[in-house]
Amino acid sequence: MYDVTSIQNLKKDVLYLVAKASFEGTLEEERDHIPEKMIEGPEPTFRCCIYKEREIVRQRIRLAEGKAPGAEDDGNIVQVIKSACADCPISSYVVTNNCQNCLGKDCIKACRFGAIEPGHTRSRIDSQKCKECGMCAKACPYNAIAHVSRPCKDSCPVDAISYDEYGVSVIDEEKCIRCGQCAAKCPFGAIGTKTWITNVIADLKAGKKVYAILAPATEGQFGKDITMESWRQAVKKVGFEDLIEAGLGGDMTTCSEAEEWLEAYRNGEKKTTSCCPGFVNMIRKHYPDLADMISTTVSPMCAVSRMIKAKDPDAVTVFVGPCVAKKSEVADQKIEGNADYALNYNEILAIMKAKDVELEPAENTYQDSTIFGKFYGNSGGVTDSVLEYMKETEQNEDIKVCKANGAAECKKALMFLQRGRLPEDFIEGMACEGGCVGGPSRNEEIIKARKVRETMIKSADDRKITDNLKRYDMDSFSMHR
């Protein structure tokens, strides 16, 4: 019996059943039976009928296999599950029961489009005439007019979501920056992302050397007892060759980024960071004239992947973290030597569960990166790391950095840069508020995770960035795109 009353449980169960069937080699036979296993009937649980519920599961299975949920595929990692959509109201402004049907009719007077008319018990808004300007809501002395909007549309920082004639959400692939916030915010789970769990499992079964690259934001996501060593032990039990901290790539990126920043600063040029793919997508799609200002340094994920492949050209590298945009970096940017796949926490946990492996408490004995590399998962972490490296190498330029925390701040900073009014020398952009720890696929709320995370990181040794990088052959691979 599967608990389909929670969207989180529904997502996890679909991923688990697909992963289990993939390991057992029965996915082709099981694919059409999974919806019936999960939705037994005869009574529906969360939709109008069991057939719609099963169709939702069916489309989620397609996403789990890396396909679009329907027949059409626009190539976007983020997809609308149409069978799960259309339950949200389209009308942006509605008159609530708080309306006193007063004689003043300030709402009607405030509307310039004739969209409001008096009703028998309260005013009425004609959605065909309403321009969603909000003047009626501001004018009402009883605050009786509410602004009701879809969570997916509200969460999108680049206005990439609209609706079709049936009220189903539509993602504009040309605008979408793949941040994944819409998928996280939809309370019906009507937006999801493609996964590579079947590909990863196929490579594990084929005996390939598969390496996990674990995001620095992971520490704190699963409580203080689940350490990097916990993850390392778990993925090795599943069949991975090893696990490497992406924070090590943060140290590597820091060195290269510092060199770029110093060169640009001395030449009077401005730059942006390149490690957040959501931020990079925002620049390329919405501020294309600034694309040349993006740092050419590869992301920490790519740096670690290149390091691994420099030693073992046949290695398969898999990023694991709370980020949806990392999937876009893998699928869309096609950077040589980058990670082959990217998984979120639910996806890697589904793979573990399919092999009866659980994350278990372990002493935090495993450390690849410096504390600064670990803080790459926080907004401002890149800046702090680069400035620390400059200090260690005695390059004390008075560099000013705009730390853009979240998509809204990124847009503001880029607008200033575009107009030549940015006072700082560089922009560190993080599309998710709080940084990677606020990613849409996070396992824990930001405030709670941050407290645990800071405690865990304090227990790490305080090695210097320059000393840490001496352990690795940095000349065996390139740090640039």
Regions found by a protein language model. Give the residues of each.
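Iron-sulfur-associated redox domains of electron-transfer enzymes in respiratory
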Residues: M1-R60, A64-G66, T193-R481
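Small-residue-rich
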Residues: K67-G75, C107-I108, V200
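N-terminal [4Fe-4S]-dependent radical SAM core
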Residues: A71-T96, F113-G114
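Gly-rich Lys/Arg/Thr-decorated short loops/hinges at beta-loop-alpha junctions or inter-strand turns
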Residues: A86-V94, E117-R122, Y163, Q181, ...
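Glycine-rich adenosyl-nucleotide cofactor-binding module
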Residues: C88-K109, K138
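A secondary-structure boundary/capping signal
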Residues: V95, D126, D172, L214-A215, ...
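Residue-level recognition of alpha-helix initiation/capping sites
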Residues: C102, K131, H147, I177, ...
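Iron-sulfur cluster-binding cysteine motifs and their immediate structural context
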Residues: G104-S127, K131, M135-I177, Q181-I197, ...
